[in-house]
Amino acid sequence: MAKELNPTENIEKLSDIQRYVTQERGTEAPFTGKLLHNKRDGVYQCLCCHQPLFISESKFDSGCGWPSFYQPIDADSIRYIDDYSHNMHRIEIRCGNCDAHLGHVFPDGPQPTGERYCINSASLNFVDDQNGEQTAG
């Protein structure tokens, strides 16, 4: 279970899918996330605590149905956990600040890292560089 949300937010404000993804380690259905096709320049934050996680320059279209990035904004912004669910080994990624579930990282991304951070839109908050507008996933 992820840590409590920051004082300006509370768990009751999360939608059912946001709560399922971030607090219960769930996964949204592919190709349904609000931020999948977002092309604006800006920063992707943790929905729960607003920790900066990814910048738009590292986002790419992997075709997998979830927003994909080739690297986090900072090494400390992400926490990595071995995940043996579904009879396979994967690397789960969580917010390094509040422990909210974000998605998984796979070794099949583009250069320069070769990694694909496959992230649930429902775990993200996007802040537009142009106008500061925020869009919750």
Curated annotation (Swiss-Prot):
Name any cofactors this protein relies on: Zn(2+)
Offer one Pfam family short name for this entry: SelR
The family database entries (SUPFAM superfamilies) matched by this protein are listed as: Mss4-like (SSF51316)
> What residues does Zn(2+) bind to?
C46, C49, C95, C98
What GO MF annotations does this protein's record show?
peptide-methionine (R)-S-oxide reductase activity; zinc ion binding
Q: According to the record, how does the cofactor bind?
A: Binds 1 zinc ion per subunit. The zinc ion is important for the structural integrity of the protein.
* GO cellular component terms, A-Z: cytoplasm
Q: Which PROSITE patterns match?
A: MSRB
Q: Which residues form the MsrB domain?
A: 7-129
Q: Cite the active-site annotation.
A: C118 (nucleophile)
Gene3D superfamilies, per the entry:
Peptide methionine sulfoxide reductase (2.170.150.20)
**What is catalyzed by this enzyme?**
L-methionyl-[protein] + [thioredoxin]-disulfide + H2O = L-methionyl-(R)-S-oxide-[protein] + [thioredoxin]-dithiol
- Which keywords label this protein? Metal-binding, Oxidoreductase, Zinc
| PANTHER family in the cross-refs | METHIONINE SULFOXIDE REDUCTASE, METHIONINE-R-SULFOXIDE REDUCTASE B1
Protein name stated in the entry: Peptide methionine sulfoxide reductase MsrB
Annotated organism of origin: Yersinia pestis
* Primary gene name: msrB
